[in-house]
Curated annotation (Swiss-Prot):
E.C. designation(s): 3.2.1.8
Family note: Belongs to the glycosyl hydrolase 11 (cellulase G) family.
Protein's UniProt name: Endo-1,4-beta-xylanase C
Position of the signal peptide: 1-25
Keywords in alphabetical order: Carbohydrate metabolism, Cellulose degradation, Glycosidase, Hydrolase, Polysaccharide degradation, Repeat, Signal, Xylan degradation
An example Gene Ontology molecular-function term: endo-1,4-beta-xylanase activity
Catalysed reactions, semicolon-separated: Endohydrolysis of (1->4)-beta-D-xylosidic linkages in xylans
């Protein structure tokens, strides 16, 4: 029998590690305080501070305020609201079910509350939405795990149409209800009908840990269907259907939601958020302009990098191909004139035209016509460009692509030489707000015109931004969802690319920052160096094992990059004289802790 020796020092170390971890878990109940950057909100708004998604919403739009901190904590004040919600945590983007996150969703909270007047109902705990829930009205579910309240008593049987039973989670007993509600919901204008799921704790508590995933497992056993998670946030809510709540205060000096992989908690930065689709719970369709991850295309510097390839295209014919070893694809197409396109390995490109009847140049994702945008997404673009000259009678700058089955040509127009009008766009279908501005939505019909499938009759879909811009983020998926809500059917994706199109004139276009992401090519999300969850990771056994691994002496050449959850981010090249941190910063933009691997050795690298 093979035996293993264990030294006394290793046993002592393991015991100390376990005790430290336990102490940390209990510490926030007695020693919690707000820390980090903060933002104070006084009207309905969603946003991000650090890697924390937050929202303040009340039915009046002016019935309170909230201060959100970059450590996840928040301070919520009600001055006079019919229904008030204050929440912070994970914005998940409706991409995965709770089973697909790679671990359990865990919430920690510490609550300090003061009494409010005229409280009809109040829910303090966990809150979120799910999309794509089969068998439910509008495929939406609003869910709650309620651990406390501003009211005199915890919610009772009045909260739901259906009592499903009781469960025991995190040392407490919860009663589970399902309710059918018609009212405001995410991503909808006006009222819609949806289900609500509730876990209501029998005895309220003002501090503790909530295993959100365990509640969802128990809900499923009771026949409640789960969907794709839109969010999971610590919540303070209070309202009254017959008046206003006045004077309530819910302070959360500690609040955190993370995904726990095995024994290692993962901060909210490890889950890709939905960027601008994080619309507020209200009767308005207006969203916000937040960008997933930490990319700021307007400030970050990229420039033209890698091999330069120039093509003059071919009259009345598409010239296409891959952009170096990147995941991107290019295309140039025109009718007449003297035109060209120059593209670079990082996806940036230049284009020029002179005397053309119609000119298109574009770079982005080329798909196989087998999957919908929902299956491929979320799809996002980050860009910075400049333009000169003129572009004739019509022109579009933004996102462009096609779908098949049905055949559709689509545009998201963020910029122009001359703003396109109704004569080019067809029938106005509506408007919505995303990425910080309102877009008007139009549908046109092209009769027997050139297409990716030859000469065809097909619809064109347009989202046209009210104010032009030359840099920022475009949530492509949000536009497509809105089009379908308006009856504009999308098919299987052929492409999604950053485009310049000119209907004449003489001009040039230069994209100096370019990045696109989708499910297959997500935005890198390393764990923040300064987060409190990093302190926990430092004390975890798996991180100790990494520290115990032989440290490598980094040499010039290629090495692989991983985030702290072991997800592969890409391969980068280290040139002689450069530091690894500099190379990581240049390639991934985000500050944080990375793991780099060269040969059989791995090493942690901090990027500030």
């Amino acid at each position: 029998m093979k035996t293993f020796s264990v030294t006394k020092s290793s046993v002592v170390f393991a015991m100390a590690l376990g005790m430290a971890s336990t102490a940390f878990a209990q510490d926030f109940c007695s020693n919690a305080q707000h820390s980090g950057q903060k933002v104070t909100i006084t009207s309905n708004q969603t946003g991000k501070i650090g890697d924390i998604g937050y929202e303040l919403w009340d039915e009046n739009g002016h019935g309170g305020s909230a201060t959100f901190y970059s450590d996840g904590s928040m301070d919520c004040n009600i001055t006079g609201a019919k229904d008030y919600l204050c929440r912070a945590g994970l914005s998940l983007g409706s991409n995965k079910t709770y089973k697909e996150l790679g671990g359990d969703m865990i919430a920690e909270f510490k609550l300090v509350k003061s009494g409010a007047q005229n409280v009809g109902y109040s829910y303090i705990g966990i809150y979120g939405w799910m999309e794509g829930v089969s068998g439910t009205p509008s495929q939406l579910v609003e869910y709650y795990v309620i651990d406390n309240t501003l009211a005199n008593d915890m919610p009772g049987s009045w909260i739901g149409n259906e009592r499903k039973g009781t469960i025991t989670v995190d040392g407490g007993t919860y009663t589970v209800y399902r309710n059918t509600r018609t009212g405001p919901a995410i991503k909808n204008s006006g009222n819609v009908t949806f289900y609500q799921y509730f876990s209501v704790r029998t005895s309220p508590r003002d501090c503790g840990t909530i295993n959100i995933s365990e509640h969802m497992r128990q809900w499923e056993k009771m026949g409640l269907t789960m969907g794709k998670l839109y969010e999971a946030k610590v919540l303070g809510e209070a309202g009254n259907v017959n008046g206003e709540v006045r004077g309530g205060h819910m302070d959360f000096p500690h609040a955190k939601v993370y995904v726990k992989n095995g024994s290692d908690p993962v901060s909210s930065s490890s889950v890709k958020s939905s960027s601008s689709t994080d619309a507020p719970k209200s009767s308005s369709s207006k969203g916000n302009g937040n960008v997933s991850g930490k990319i700021d295309a307007c400030k970050d510097v990229m420039g033209h990098e890698g091999k330069e390839t120039r093509t003059q295209g071919q009259n009345n014919s598409s010239v296409t191909g891959n952009v170096g070893s990147s995941p991107y694809h290019y295309e140039i197409w025109y009718q007449g004139g003297n035109n060209s396109m120059t593209f670079y390995d990082n996806g940036t490109y230049k284009a020029s035209w002179n005397g053309t009847n119609d000119f298109l140049a574009r770079v982005g994702f080329k798909y196989d016509e087998k999957h919908t945008y929902e299956e491929l997404g979320p799809i996002d673009a980050y860009y910075k460009w400049s333009k000169q000259g003129s572009a004739g009678g019509y022109n579009y700058i933004g996102i462009y692509g096609w779908t098949v089955d049905p055949l559709v040509e689509y545009y998201i127009v963020d910029d122009w030489f001359n703003k396109p009008g109704a004569n080019l766009l067809g029938q106005r279908k509506g408007e919505f707000t995303v990425d910080g501005d309102t877009y008007e939505i139009w549908q046109n019909t092209r009769v027997q015109q050139p297409s990716i499938k030859g000469t065809q009759t097909f619809p064109q879909y347009f989202s046209v931004r009210k104010s032009a811009r030359s840099c920022g983020h475009i949530d492509i998926t949000a536009h497509m969802k809105k089009w379908e809500e308006l009856g504009m059917k999308m098919g299987k994706m052929y492409e999604a690319k950053v485009l310049v199109e000119a209907g004449g004139g003489s001009g040039s276009f230069d994209v100096t920052y370019f990045k696109m992401t989708d499910k297959a090519h997500p935005l890198a999300q390393p764990e923040p160096e300064s987060s409190s969850s990093e302190a926990k990771v430092e004390s975890s056994s798996s991180t100790v094992a990494l520290h115990a691994a032989p440290k490598m002496e980094l040499k010039s050449g290629n090495f692989q990059v991983f985030d702290m959850q072991g997800r592969f981010l890409g391969t980068v090249k280290l040139d002689a004289g450069a530091s690894v941190a500099q190379v990581l910063k240049a390639n991934f933009k985000n500050a944080g802790i990375y793991m780099v691997k060269q040969g059989n050795f791995m090493q942690r690298v901090a990027v500030k």
